[in-house]
UniProtKB/Swiss-Prot annotation:
Species whose genome carries this gene: Homo sapiens (Human)
Region (Testis-specific N-terminal extension): 1-73
Function noted in UniProt: May play an important role in regulating the switch between different pathways for energy production during spermiogenesis and in the spermatozoon. Required for sperm motility and male fertility.
Protein name, UniProt field: Glyceraldehyde-3-phosphate dehydrogenase, testis-specific
EC numbers for this chain: 1.2.1.12
Disulfide bonds: none
Catalytic site positions: 224
Name of the gene this protein is made from: GAPDHS
Organ and tissue specificity: Testis specific.
Signal peptide limits: none
Length: 408
């Protein structure tokens, strides 16, 4: 508006009236008095002025202390590229662990659909918190998360959200060269949620101490199966020695498989219906263990069976031991590790369990003491369960937190 609004306020004017001036009257003349002879007055005693001592000097004003420097605590912030099974569960794990997610990128999922897919999960159930799309952002438990739909990592504005640590969970950008576009776009570090052909590979509880902040800004969290096998193999090898071994994972079907028979160029039987078949498949998990435990190079290999279950898988490690040991000694060694240095990573159970008992379990590997067997003191079969989705996603977040702690 070009004119100002004028607000009129009623003002009461009070008129002050002066009191009329009093009339001055002359006093009556005094009556005459008899003359009295004046009496001599005593001389006044001189009054000595008391001299007060000067007040003590004021103490010097204390110097103002310099202002204290308030250090701002660094905070781990995370960006997620790829909002598929692992991407969404990494976000859930971050919310559970109090890790701040600042951005999600997925060119194939509309923001409103992100809300739906994150809120409802056929395997892990409905998200217990609040989730909505508001003011152009994904809002989870009142935490605002920027949403992007960039097709290439170099297009994602990571700098605009504070240069977070990025989880590369598309399954596409697996090499250092491909993932380096995240760094160019402003990401501080990148964790690939899959095996990588050339990025340093880490398994929490096994070799995370080898992480070098000065030279490693792109790393791999290996595979879910490697995260299950490696902690168990580490305990057995360090205590008894593994001469050689074969690993088999009985693995739930994944999104890359077919619901009904379809084409598969890489391996023909991979294209058969996932819900109808037990499908032999290849896996690099056993060989990947040799990257995190170099002493086992050339001693392990393995394969997989894809089975018609939606989640939770199990590793069968059959190996020959260098030091003879009864099965009871193996159980005690694993139990001690689960209670000690590998707590939270490796677990131990003697219950009569089945696969669904581990749905939502956040451990990397749960040793089933009653399922294993020994042929003799040198040749054993060891069984360990894992939630190949949820447990793995928690390890991704744990690796992010560990890297952040080392980067300080």
């Amino acid at each position: 508006m070009s004119k100002r609004d004028i607000v009129l306020t009623n003002v009461t004017v009070v008129q002050l009236l002066r009191q009329p001036c009093p009339v001055t009257r002359a006093p009556p003349p005094p009556e005459p008095k008899a003359e009295v002879e004046p009496q001599p007055q005593p001389e006044p005693t001189p009054v000595r002025e008391e001299i007060k001592p000067p007040p003590p000097p004021l103490p010097p004003h204390p110097a103002t202390p310099p202002p204290k420097m308030v250090s701002v605590a660094r905070e781990l912030t995370v960006g997620i590229n790829g909002f598929g099974r692992i991407g969404r569960l990494v976000l859930r794990a971050c919310m559970e662990k109090g890790v701040k997610v600042v951005a999600v990128n997925d060119p194939f999922i509309d923001p409103e659909y992100m809300v739906y897919m994150f809120k409802y999960d056929s395997t892990h159930g409905r998200y217990k918190g609040s989730v909505e799309f508001r003011n152009g952002q994904l809002v989870v438990d009142n935490h605002e998360i920027s949403v992007y739909q960039c097709k290439e990592p170099k297009q994602i504005p990571w700098r605009a959200v504070g240069s977070p640590y990025v989880v590369e969970s598309t399954g596409v950008y697996l090499s250092i060269q491909a993932a380096s576009d995240h760094i160019s776009a402003g990401a501080q570090r990148v964790v690939i949620s899959a095996p990588s052909p050339d990025a340093p590979m880490f398994v929490m509880g096994v070799n995370e101490n080898d992480y070098n902040p000065g030279s490693m800004n792109i790393v791999s969290n290996a595979s879910c199966t490697t995260n299950c096998l490696a902690p168990l193999a580490k305990v057995i090898h360090e205590r008894f020695g593994i001469v050689e071994g074969l690993m088999t994972t009985v693995h739930s079907y994944t999104a890359t498989q077919k619901t009904v028979d379809g084409p598969s160029r890489k391996a023909w039987r991979d294209g058969r219906g996932a819900h109808q078949n037990i499908i032999p498949a290849s896996t690099g998990a056993a060989k990947a263990v040799t990257k995190v435990i170099p002493e086992l190079k050339g001693k392990l290999t393995g394969m997989a069976f894809r089975v018609p279950t939606p989640d939770v898988s199990v590793v069968d490690l059959t190996c020959r031991l260098a030091q003879p040991a009864p099965y009871s000694a193996i159980k005690e060694a694993v139990k001690a590790a689960a209670k000690g240095p590998m707590a939270g990573i490796l677990a131990y159970t003697e219950d009569e369990v089945v696969s669904t008992d581990f749905l939502g379990d956040t451990h990397s590997s749960i040793f089933d003491a009653k399922a294993g067997i020994a042929l003799n003191d040198n040749f054993v079969k060891l069984i360990s369960w894992y939630d190949n989705e949820y447990g793995y996603s928690h390890r991704v977040v744990d690796l992010l937190r560990y890297m952040f702690s080392r980067d300080k």
